[in-house]
Amino acid sequence: MEVNILAFIATTLFVLVPTAFLLIIYVKTVSQSD
């Protein structure tokens, strides 16, 4: 099976970007709650 590097990168970014965004919001919310 050939590994499509571009598809792999696109999928990784598609997962990591929203995850990082939500993580930042979570951290800010916890910091403000304290």
From Swiss-Prot:
GO terms for biological process: photosynthesis, light reaction. It comes from the Eukaryota. It holds the Pfam family PsbM. Its main location: plastid. The chain crosses the membrane at residues 5-25. One of its GO terms (cellular component) is chloroplast thylakoid membrane. It is a single-pass membrane protein. Keywords: Chloroplast, Membrane, Photosynthesis, Photosystem II, Plastid, Reaction center, Thylakoid, Transmembrane, Transmembrane helix. It is found in: Plastid, Chloroplast thylakoid membrane. Belongs to the PsbM family. PSII is composed of 1 copy each of membrane proteins PsbA, PsbB, PsbC, PsbD, PsbE, PsbF, PsbH, PsbI, PsbJ, PsbK, PsbL, PsbM, PsbT, PsbX, PsbY, PsbZ, Psb30/Ycf12, at least 3 peripheral proteins of the oxygen-evolving complex and a large number of cofactors. It forms dimeric complexes. One of the components of the core complex of photosystem II (PSII). PSII is a light-driven water:plastoquinone oxidoreductase that uses light energy to abstract electrons from H(2)O, generating O(2) and a proton gradient subsequently used for ATP formation. It consists of a core antenna complex that captures photons, and an electron transfer chain that converts photonic excitation into a charge separation. This subunit is found at the monomer-monomer interface. This is Photosystem II reaction center protein M. It comes from Citrus sinensis.
